[in-house]
């Protein structure tokens, strides 16, 4: 008897190598965010800080900061390779940064709840600083449960025979479809756990819109203008 697991999901993993100055600049920005936000009483009892949820001006715009320009370039290179691998060299698509934000997990079991990014097509996470001796705080992807009835629910860990849990190693980049549900498992490291998340929109080139693909924003017209 053979049991076949169908519908693989492409997740790109690459371990980047920033030079010392670039790595230090990114870490400094995340340290400032950590110190400035966690000192506020309303956030002191949280087990995570995510810049897209806190509502502080500019905290979802890290991709505009000088410290993250190297990372932007690396992300562009690997998004291009990801799309070429899936669609071929003539796919004609363009990637756009929607937003990028910092994530800080507390050392005593910090987590991020299960979620997806419905506003984007591709999402990415880059680990700026983690405890290399402690691989807790993994990113876990959850398989879609649409294929099983509610009376025959299969636990995710039993169904995920092909993996789905990624260790947060320093300078690791992960790229994945934004609709893929994911969460951060409890982090128990001795040092800070800093990462940057990106949401990307994938569109056609300007003037190249076609059925079932999102046209370039330059081709949009505000309703009522």
Annotate the PLM regions.
Residues 1-89, 111, 193-195, 199-225:
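Non-heme Fe(II)/2-oxoglutarate
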Residues 12, 98-100, 122-124, 194-198:
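Hydrophobic residues positioned within well-ordered beta-strands of beta-sheet architectures
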